[in-house]
Amino acid sequence: MTLWLPTTGKVYLPPTPPVARVQSTDEYVERTNVFYHAMSDRLLTVGHPYFDVRSVNGGSIEVPKVSGNQYRAFRVTFPDPNRFALADMSVYNPEKERLVWACVGLEIGRGQPLGVGTSGHPLFNKVKDTENNSNYQGNSTDDRQNTSFDPKQVQMFVVGCVPCLGEHWDRALVCESERNNQAGKCPPLELKNTVIEDGDMFDIGFGNINNKALSVTKSDVSLDIVNETCKYPDFLTMANDVYGDACFFFARREQCYARHYFVRGGAVGDALPDAAVNQDHNFYLPAQSTQQQNNLANSTYFPTVSGSLVTSDAQLFNRPFWLRRAQGHNNGILWGNQMFITVADNTRNTNFTISVTSDGNAINEYNSQNIREFLRHVEEYQLSIILQLCKIPLKAEVLTQINAMNSGILEDWQLGFVPTPDNAVQDIYRYIDSKATKCPDAVQPKDKEDPFGKYTFWNVDLTEKLSLDLDQYPLGRKFIFQAGLQRRPRTIKSSVKVSKGTKRKRT
């Protein structure tokens, strides 16, 4: 029998107030036919690949940490186009428009040969190789070994006009009811979002985790990350950013495979269920009391990965990238006349080994006690960018969205809302710091605060390195050819007529 029943589900009505719609920059930004080329100098850095080398008293850093497994976060600044000496001042009307830069091309140049650099720890927490065993591992108080390995191979860069957002797992706050019952227990974890700064470590095969807070043994990972937080770009959050400023586009290439299989030392935190509650031998059968297997070994297994082959056939660098359509609403507009380029690349990860004598004298025979070995890592970068000059109309609906997105942009354009002064005449004392006059005002005018001043970046100033002569630079010539802007050479017709030979008649 078919019966009619009323709908039991809830009825959802649209919200009464209108929902604000974020416009794409293509809807209100007018692009011009003026292009500039910007190129940095060679950017070089040298340091120790595993840690900072400090002075004897520890007060200063003598050799900084420079690892191939670090992020390089470049903050590139450009001149203000509204104060720029344009060759053609009829490009825009300063009374009704403002100028901004748009990134249309980028090439991240990398010097130095390809190479694999290893990392490790002289006291690495590994009991034994668990892939090929000949005898059962017994109990011991310290089984740490001197171990090294090559990291996961990573090539990656993220381009935007605000810093790249990273994510990592960290210790979470314990609930109030469990705060006094945490001895010997695994702490709760939470996913945290932080800005990726220059010098932060990326994942090399042990995960994006805060090793400093979650590894009390200081021997679970290699030396270069044991006191660091490994971060990974939060592509999901940046892709869903309403304005799309953090990531115009990105390129990523990661590869690894499990090379060695080890097990940790120490007691197992989460015991096997059979040993804990005797669940009818669902996981294993106990050994006889006379066997070594009677004392169950550790089951905290982990691999050390390898990045495998490094080849020039799979390089993301030293090649141009053209931006036609960004993944978000911001199609390459550089708000604040700056661009953030976050790079991760360990395919040029060679660590130099430098040896000297302990006393500084020449040696005639080898003696390891009289030799000191040093490690150094070097990196070389060069940034080339193609900029397009764009115009923004000073309309109410456009300024409203820009003000909601970032009010500092309007202040830079000198379009801030100026309140009506309370009194046109102000008091100005000449000797304000003397004892004869009143104390100075407690609130002093503050300089404009840099929203990213608390972060560490590799600052690259290109305010005086822009050029209209695109054909004088490698990336500029590639852009001219790619955009079809090259001038075709005229065909020169020869005025000399070639006389035809006399054709013989057949007889």
Swiss-Prot record:
Species of provenance: Human papillomavirus 15
Protein keywords: Capsid protein, Disulfide bond, Host nucleus, Host-virus interaction, Late protein, T=7 icosahedral capsid protein, Viral attachment to host cell, Viral penetration into host cytoplasm, Virion, Virus endocytosis by host, Virus entry into host cell
Polar residues: compositionally biased ranges: 132-147
InterPro entries, alphabetized: Capsid_L1_Papillomavir, Capsid_L1_sf_Papillomavir, dsDNA_vir_gr_I_capsid
Keyword Disulfide bond assigned: yes
SUPFAM superfamilies xrefs: Group I dsDNA viruses
One BP term from GO: endocytosis involved in viral entry into host cell
Assembly and binders: Self-assembles into homopentamers. The capsid has an icosahedral symmetry and consists of 72 capsomers, with each capsomer being a pentamer of L1. Interacts with the minor capsid protein L2; this interaction is necessary for viral genome encapsidation. Interacts with protein E2; this interaction enhances E2-dependent replication and transcription activation.
Pfam families attached to this UniProt entry: Late_protein_L1
GO cellular component terms listed in the entry, alphabetical order: host cell nucleus; T=7 icosahedral viral capsid
Family statement: Belongs to the papillomaviridae L1 protein family.
Region: Disordered, residue numbers: 122-147
Transmembrane segments: none
Protein name in the entry: Major capsid protein L1
Localisation per UniProt entry: Virion; Host nucleus
Molecular function GO labels: structural molecule activity
